[in-house]
């Protein structure tokens, strides 16, 4: 065996092992690997030098020694690589970990608008009383908003100072933004003659008015109950039950006052005294006028019914002590943060 080459190999082994052990990063280790095991590395040069040895026995023995060294260095490099990778991971975990003791970023959660809350609550109360929720169009013809509801052409509600009329007619009919959801009652009675009819219609309505207690657009829910032998006592029970449930006060003071609406006879306005306040009007109601039944093809000698209309904004203002109706539509986040509700409040 060529003694000089053998001594050189043994000396190289000590040097390579030391460099592998002292490598402080994966980049340094890769340089060591290329230096010894790469295509232009020392081990490759040793194998090339074997070609110059003529003695086959010496060539074979030196080749085995070089192979052993190559395998040893390869194993040492793999082992060192695993160690360095583990150290790198630990370093990242220590320096990039989230400190859970720090205060979390404030989370902004949206809130349910008071009108959405009240609408949902009102419909739920009436649903428990057997009323079915129905919908209708916001843009209506005069027949469904006024004529069918026994509102004559000279009635003040039909004047342009109170009602929004559209410029263009549809099928030669004058169109309006509905002033109440009673138009949905008319459409329902036109479509079905299956009794009892027991519905509530909630939605946007429009009137030409704007101040602290009025807005051009607001929300109403109107109810209708039609069957044989419907009476005023049933109407009063329905109103009492609803108001007691909504305000959560079984001792709520409620009074009915005689009034006039063209679509009901007799008619009444309902006042409440809430939390010791003075009497406040909350809704209008009455027994459905026979002319309304005639206009939709229902025999008023056999069937009768009652109807009521409630302003959603009015209920919300009373229950949550909101003084200005216009604040519902100002889109102020600070206002909604104060008066809004968590989504879980919707039942």
Curated annotation (Swiss-Prot):
- EC code(s) of this entry: 6.1.1.20
User: A single GO CC term, please?
Assistant: cytoplasm
Q: Which Gene3D superfamilies match?
A: Bira Bifunctional Protein, Domain 2
What InterPro entries is this protein classified in?
aa-tRNA-synth_II, aa-tRNA-synth_II/BPL/LPL, Phe-tRNA-synth_IIc_asu, Phe-tRNA_ligase_II_N, Phe_tRNA_ligase_alpha1_bac, Phenylalanyl-tRNA_Synthase, tRNA-bd_arm
In terms of CDD domains, this protein maps to:
PheRS_alpha_core (cd00496)
One matching Pfam family: tRNA-synt_2d
Which cofactors are named for this entry? Mg(2+)
| Cofactor comment | Binds 2 magnesium ions per tetramer.
Which top EC class is given?
ligase
Question: What keywords is this UniProt entry annotated with?
Answer: Aminoacyl-tRNA synthetase, ATP-binding, Cytoplasm, Ligase, Magnesium, Metal-binding, Nucleotide-binding, Protein biosynthesis
Q: Which residues bind Mg(2+)?
A: 265
The record describes its quaternary structure and partners as: Tetramer of two alpha and two beta subunits.
Q: Which family does it belong to?
A: Belongs to the class-II aminoacyl-tRNA synthetase family. Phe-tRNA synthetase alpha subunit type 1 subfamily.
Q: List the protein's name.
A: Phenylalanine--tRNA ligase alpha subunit
Natural source organism: Wolbachia pipientis wMel
């Amino acid at each position: 065996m060529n003694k000089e080459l053998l001594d050189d190999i043994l000396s190289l082994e000590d040097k390579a092992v030391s460099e592998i052990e002292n490598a402080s990063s994966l980049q340094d280790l890769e340089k060591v690997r290329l230096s010894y095991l790469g295509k232009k590395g020392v081990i490759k040069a040793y194998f090339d030098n074997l070609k110059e040895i003529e003695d086959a026995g010496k060539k074979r023995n030196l080749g085995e020694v070089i192979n052993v060294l190559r395998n040893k260095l390869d194993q040492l490099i793999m082992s060192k690589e695993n160690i360095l990778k583990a150290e790198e991971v630990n370093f990242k975990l220590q320096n990039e970990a989230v400190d859970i003791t720090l205060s979390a970023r404030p989370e902004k959660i949206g809130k349910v608008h008071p009108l959405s809350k009240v609408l949902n609550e009102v419909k739920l109360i009436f649903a428990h009383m057997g009323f079915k929720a129905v919908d209708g169009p916001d843009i209506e013809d005069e027949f469904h908003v006024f004529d069918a509801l026994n509102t004559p052409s000279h009635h003040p509600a039909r004047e342009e100072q109170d009602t929004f009329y559209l410029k263009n007619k549809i099928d030669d009919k004058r169109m309006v933004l509905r002033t109440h959801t009673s138009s949905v009652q008319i459409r329902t009675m036109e479509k079905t003659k299956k009794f009892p009819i027991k519905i509530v219609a909630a939605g946007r309505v429009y009137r030409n008015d704007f101040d602290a207690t009025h807005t051009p657009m607001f929300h109403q829910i109107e109810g209708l109950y039609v069957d044989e032998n419907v009476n005023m006592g049933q109407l009063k029970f329905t109103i009492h039950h609803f108001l007691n449930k909504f305000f959560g006060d079984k001792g709520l003071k409620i009074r009915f006052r005689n009034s006039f609406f063209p679509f009901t006879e007799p008619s009444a306005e309902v006042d409440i005294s809430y939390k010791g306040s003075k009497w406040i009007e909350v809704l209008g109601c009455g027994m459905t006028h026979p002319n309304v039944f005639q206009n939709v093809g229902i025999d008023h000698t056999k069937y009768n019914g009652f109807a009521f209309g409630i302003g959603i904004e009015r209920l919300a203002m009373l229950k949550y002590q909101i003084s200005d109706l216009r604040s519902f539509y100002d889109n102020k986040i600070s206002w909604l943060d104060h008066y809004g509700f968590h989504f879980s409040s919707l039942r």
